[in-house]
Regions:
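Nucleic-acid modification enzymes, centered on SAM-dependent nucleic-acid methyltransferases
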Residues: 26, 30-35
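A conserved structural/catalytic subdomain of Rossmann-like adenosyl-cofactor enzymes
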Residues: 142-143, 149-152, 156-380
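Conserved phosphate/pyrophosphate-binding and hydrolysis machinery centered on Walker-type P-loop NTPases
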Residues: 9-13, 35-39, 208
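Long recognition/docking surfaces used for binding and targeting
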Residues: 1-26
Length: 380
């Protein structure tokens, strides 16, 4: 019939991708609110990464498989560059085909939580000449052991990937009451406050943004020296409440580049969150330990040099002394029988609120100064 002479093998990736997106577009956008990462962004990210035919590549939120396809295309283009006459020379073909096909079959991995989208990703890969073998349906945030147990695919092992390229879902919150794995994430715990006077117990956060947890999950999957290219909302990079996330990124990765994407980057898909691409290289375990140790040393020096704990203890004593004195005054003036009774009066409560507010401001000013000194010392 009409389709008999058609050959998709020779069709370029962009044409196939455009056809697939047109065919599947309403399915993704309408039914699931999922969005394709624009091809221009996918191509840019894959082009700048030094992916080779023996590299092991993963997308932990693979959606329709765009990043995996462009990685495959990059390796296939390299094969064609090395063996340009593969179509007419059988000896070249014997090298050309396994060069990229082994990569597609053994080195490309994708995780997608939605089963129907995962199937669509596999179909997309098949249309583009395979690579679907290691695309699985799973929550991308469960442990590698859980993934291996559920899928019997031993390729999904922590510490084995050379490249992770991903655009994780933004804005969703994982609640610790819903997912037991929250407690296994460093970024699922409340950060340690080095300026706290008393030792703090380790506390699990009530919830954490999915994109933040994916940073840690991707770190776990990478080899030492492996590269992570991840699209993140700018809130992770700029919000003061996210400083602990940026600190953790510094501990785990060498920051290669941060590329700001235009506000309109995802507008064609109906998403308008300002975002950036982070290119990160995983430190060795020793380097991470060295960085953390240096930070602890700076903290220790600053605490000692500023007599921080002694000052805080002195202020606490001063508060208690003033509280006792005020309660005594009220007790005598109003003829109260006890100090606790005096502390229940409206006069004492108003006065005490002002006192605590004044000291809280002093503490905040001291902490701000110490934090600034810490940042300056860290940059030296």
């Amino acid at each position: 019939g009409y389709l008999a002479p058609a050959n998709l093998h020779g069709t370029d990736l962009d044409s196939k991708g455009r056809a697939f997106e047109t065919f599947m577009g309403s399915f993704f956008r309408g039914n699931f609110g999922q969005y394709f990462t624009p091809r221009e962004i996918v191509k840019f990210i894959v082009d700048v990464l030094p992916i080779e035919h023996d590299s092991k590549v993963l997308d932990t939120s693979c959606g329709s498989g765009g990043f995996l396809l462009y990685a495959l295309n990059k390796v296939r283009d390299k094969a064609t560059e090395l063996y340009p006459n593969y179509q007419t020379d059988t000896r070249q073909y014997k090298h050309w085909f396994p060069y990229w096909h082994d990569f597609a079959e053994k080195n490309l991995y994708g995780i997608e939580i939605n089963e129907q989208i995962s199937r669509a990703a596999k179909m997309n890969m098949i249309i583009h000449d395979d690579g679907h073998t290691n695309v699985i349906t799973s929550d991308g945030l469960v442990s590698d052991e859980t993934i291996i147990t559920r899928t019997a695919n031993h390729g999904f092992k922590y510490g084995t990937f050379d490249f992770i390229i991903t655009n994780p879902p933004f804005g969703s919150t994982i609640r610790q009451t819903e997912q037991a794995y929250m407690k296994t994430y460093q970024l699922g715990k409340k950060e340690e406050d080095w300026l706290a006077v008393k030792a703090q117990p380790e506390n699990i956060r009530d919830g954490q943004n999915t994109e933040v947890l994916f940073i840690e999950q991707d770190y776990k999957f990478l080899k030492e020296g492996g590269y992570l290219a991840i699209i993140l909302p700018d809130s992770v990079l700029t919000n003061s409440t996210m400083q602990y996330v940026r600190t953790q990124i510094e501990d785990w990765f060498r920051i290669i580049a941060v590329v700001s994407l235009p506000q309109t980057a995802f507008s064609a898909n109906g998403a308008g969150v300002k975002s950036s691409v982070l290119f990160l290289k995983k430190w060795s375990k020793k380097q991470t330990e060295r960085i953390v140790s240096q930070k602890k040393e700076i903290e220790s020096h600053l605490l000692n040099d500023n007599d921080y704990l002694a000052i805080r203890q002195e202020w606490d004593k001063e508060i208690k002394s003033q509280q006792k004195q005020k309660a005594n005054e009220i007790k005598k003036a109003l003829g109260k029988t006890s100090m606790s009774e005096a502390k229940q009066t409206e006069e004492y409560k108003l006065w005490n609120a002002d006192l605590l507010s004044a000291f809280a401001n002093k503490v905040d000013n001291l902490k701000d100064r110490m934090t600034l000194e810490y940042q300056q010392a860290k940059q030296k």
